[in-house]
A protein has these predicted regions:
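Short, intrinsically disordered N-terminal pre-domain segments
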Residues: 1-21, 108-113
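Surface-exposed ligand/attachment interfaces on beta-rich extracellular proteins
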Residues: 21-42, 65, 100
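Tight coil/turn sites that cap or link beta-strands
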Residues: 29-31, 69, 75-79
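Noncatalytic modules at the cell exterior or secretory-pathway interfaces
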Residues: 45-47, 85-102
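Short, surface-exposed beta-strand/strand-loop-strand elements in extracellular ectodomains
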Residues: 50-72, 106-107
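Solvent-exposed strand-loop boundary residues in beta-sheet-rich modules
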Residues: 63-65, 99, 110-112
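Beta-sandwich interaction modules
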Residues: 74-90
């Protein structure tokens, strides 16, 4: 988690309540070839990826990911959850491994219309 300013300036903020739908969970597989864990979704509220496999999976919020160019590594047995305190990311989420393959459980929640 990054730095958080606990003494922000007095600025008016317009906050709208987002109502989420229930999560959708799918099984996915990460290999040494880039694959899409989640397609772009303009209604995405958040997502999580659990690495149920035996090798580290590299994740990036982009169509391009590599074992040397990624945003988050997910070791075996770990869960990555998107940051809920920042703006929503609605684009493609890609995964890859440096070697071998890994089974993933990918969960996505969407905003109710």
């Amino acid at each position: 988690m990054g730095l958080v300013n606990l003494n922000p300036p007095n600025v008016a903020v317009n906050i709208a309540e987002d109502i989420r739908n229930s999560d959708t969970v799918t099984a996915a597989n990460a290999t040494t070839t880039t694959s899409v864990a989640l397609a772009a979704n303009p209604l995405r509220a958040g997502y999580s990826i659990y690495n149920a496999g035996t090798v580290t999976v590299f994740v990036r919020e982009n169509a391009t990911v590599a074992a040397a160019l990624y945003k988050h590594p997910i070791p075996p047995g770990y869960l990555f959850e998107s940051e809920f305190t920042s703006s929503r990311y609605t684009g493609i989420i890609s995964v890859i491994t440096a070697s071998g393959s890994s089974n993933l459980m990918v969960s996505e929640s969407t905003i109710a219309a």
